[in-house]
């Protein structure tokens, strides 16, 4: 499944519990090299980028590594699967 499709699936299928989901991206500015973005921060997604609400932040989809559910640490989508 493409990352765009996985993001949209979570956004629409689990919208009542959307605050339980995060996207993990590569981030060179953090110690771990990873950063979690809550699904509640997502404005929209297209074929190339993830756009966040209320900011001018645009994240290239090639930086997205996984989608994770926080409540049980379940892996919803992972790059390469």
UniProtKB/Swiss-Prot annotation:
Segments traversing the membrane: none
Signal sequence, start to end: none
Recorded family membership: Belongs to the UPF0248 family.
Protein's UniProt name: UPF0248 protein SSO2687
Organism: Saccharolobus solfataricus (strain ATCC 35092 / DSM 1617 / JCM 11322 / P2)
């Amino acid at each position: 499944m493409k990352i765009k499709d996985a993001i949209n699936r979570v956004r629409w299928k689990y919208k009542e519990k959307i605050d339980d989901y995060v996207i993990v991206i590569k981030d060179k500015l953090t110690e771990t090299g990873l950063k979690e973005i809550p699904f509640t921060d997502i404005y929209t997604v297209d074929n190339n980028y993830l756009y966040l609400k209320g900011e001018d932040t645009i994240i290239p989809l090639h930086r997205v590594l996984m989608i994770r559910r926080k409540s049980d640490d379940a892996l919803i989508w992972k790059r390469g699967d």
